[in-house]
Amino acid sequence: MKFNLLFILLIFQFSFSQQRTCKSNLQMKKIMNNPIAKQKYLDLQQKFGVELSKLQNQQNKSAINTNSRNNIPVAVHFPNVATNSTDKSCLRQLVQNQIDILNADFNATNSDISLWTPTVSAIYPRTNIGSLNVQFILATQNHPAGTGIANGQVAVTFGTNFLSGADEDSQWRGYINIVVRVAGALGYSPLGGSPNDGSTVVINYDVFGSGTGCTGYVPQGDYNLGRTLSHELGHFFNLDHTFGTDQCLPSNTDEVIDTPQCKGSGGCPEIGSVAGCVAGEKSLTMNYMDYTDDACMYMFTAGQATRMRAYYNAISSQLFTNVLSNDSFQFKDFALFPNPNTGSFKISFKPETNEQIEIIVYDISGRNIYNKTFQNSGMFDQELFLNTISSGVYFVNIQNGESKMVKRILVE
């Protein structure tokens, strides 16, 4: 009898662990039950509505600011980590890995976006891929007083009782705050976060980032590619689940015109195999705002991107700009070509200082695949050969003294 009970419990635990869970609906109930928080939320939603109307009323949708990429300051917090320097170093790398994933997912430069083929898009005739055109960047300057983080260090905190278990902290207002801890689900976020209040996106410790992770923070199972944060940050930028309240009713909508009405999907269903609520339509199971596995979600829609852009416009004045270093920095006479390429490309620019030049290339998981230091001869002009790497998106970090820039390349 004991054996049978133990077996049942193990099966239950395994089954539960296979289903994506998100507590954002519970988070919203807490907000709506607090009169002050509710009014703040409604005020911000009203502002969002104005911004959304502006975008939707533009005759030429390409006039939306697509040429200038907006930088968004991020701070990441590990409340339960001690001060071990090795752990800190590993977690900072894991944080950057997760930031790189966000930047790829929100800008449609993720390598698996190639799965959206003409054959797949034909199944969803009114749906196009969307890009928010933003850059999430770890803050490095003017950190909040008393945090112990010096200028030049990234905004990653360790082992402090950040928020005292709450879900916002005014000390960290002006940032997108990500808290990595035991979340009671894969993660959660308010539906429309407020940087002014220090709102947070909470992520469970075992679904943060990708790869081998760090001690106590190893990405696990079907949610090991960092897409949980893409999902939850979608909520922060005012996106609901594609399946809304998970009912096929006329009133059930995510307020996005190009996501078919549907019920939620889990696991990794074959593309086009899940029927939508409207006859002839299929559920957009590969969308970040569904409940499918990390490996089986890879896109936002153009309608979702417009909605997120409107929300960004509504909160952009709340985001601090003085916490990012070299916001618009670019080396003089900089060129990187060809891009896309087959693994060989040329970099040229005029260095800012007489110091050495370091080139580091990371893959989309944050793995360092190239690292070389060059002597400075007054004009940098080098061809890099990465012919043994597989196709996909890579990030080229170029540093000369305190000057640093990052460029994204696509290897075909």
Can you name each region flagged by the protein language model?
Residues I8-S17:
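Hydrophobic h-region of N-terminal signal peptides that target proteins for export
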Residues F329-F337, N341-E412:
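C-terminal outer-membrane/trafficking sorting elements
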Residues Q18-R69, F106:
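N-terminal zymogen propeptides
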